[in-house]
Amino acid sequence: MASSIVSSAAVATRANGAQASMVGPFTGLKSTASFPVSRKQNLDITSIASNGGRVRCMQVWPPINMKKYETLSYLPDLSDEQLLKEVEYLLKNGWVPCLEFETEHGFVYRENNKSPGYYDGRYWTMWKLPMFGCTDATQVLAEVEEAKKAYPQAWIRIIGFDNVRQVQCISFIAYKPEGY
């Protein structure tokens, strides 16, 4: 019996020693209730972001006789060298060049319905077939020239299609008819 009493006393001593070295869970933390609240609630969303000084230098796109065709259509027309570089970029990324043309409206328009849909000018007629396997940018520009001869009053654009992801990755106007 004496041995059992000694061992239980040793266990009790160890447990008490471990409890004595433990730190209380919130020792040293202060309550936030003692800090004064000096922040006012600002529910005005106009103070979050502002372009105040820049408003005077912004301009509005003139909509009369200045139609927008693609994302960067406000830039000057691309020269033959710039077109060649764009097509080389398209081919370097592994995209398939496609040519499309539109004979009546080279811009988005809504003739049949007020809501966007198939007949709102976003879908153009494809020129021949996509140029699968094309590795030379001059071949694409030769097709643009051929399309110009066939339809001189049409808008012609070049599209880069990623056939792996099944998405159109790039699109730009290669030719606009006279007067546009």
From Swiss-Prot:
Q: Which SMART domains match?
A: RuBisCO_small
Q: Which InterPro entries does the record match to this protein? A: RuBisCO_ssu, RuBisCO_ssu_dom, RuBisCO_ssu_N, RuBisCO_ssu_sf
Query: What GO terms in the biological process aspect are recorded for it?
Result: photorespiration; reductive pentose-phosphate cycle
User: Transit peptide: where?
Assistant: 1-56
Keywords carried by this UniProt record: Calvin cycle, Carbon dioxide fixation, Chloroplast, Photorespiration, Photosynthesis, Plastid, Transit peptide
Q: Where in the cell is it found?
A: Plastid, Chloroplast
Under SUPFAM superfamilies, the record lists: RuBisCO, small subunit
Q: Does the keyword Transit peptide apply?
A: yes
Any matching Pfam family: RuBisCO_small
Q: What does this protein do?
A: RuBisCO catalyzes two reactions: the carboxylation of D-ribulose 1,5-bisphosphate, the primary event in carbon dioxide fixation, as well as the oxidative fragmentation of the pentose substrate. Both reactions occur simultaneously and in competition at the same active site. Although the small subunit is not catalytic it is essential for maximal activity.
Could you say which protein family the record assigns here? Belongs to the RuBisCO small chain family.
Q: Specify the protein name.
A: Ribulose bisphosphate carboxylase small subunit, chloroplastic 4
Species this protein is from:
Solanum tuberosum
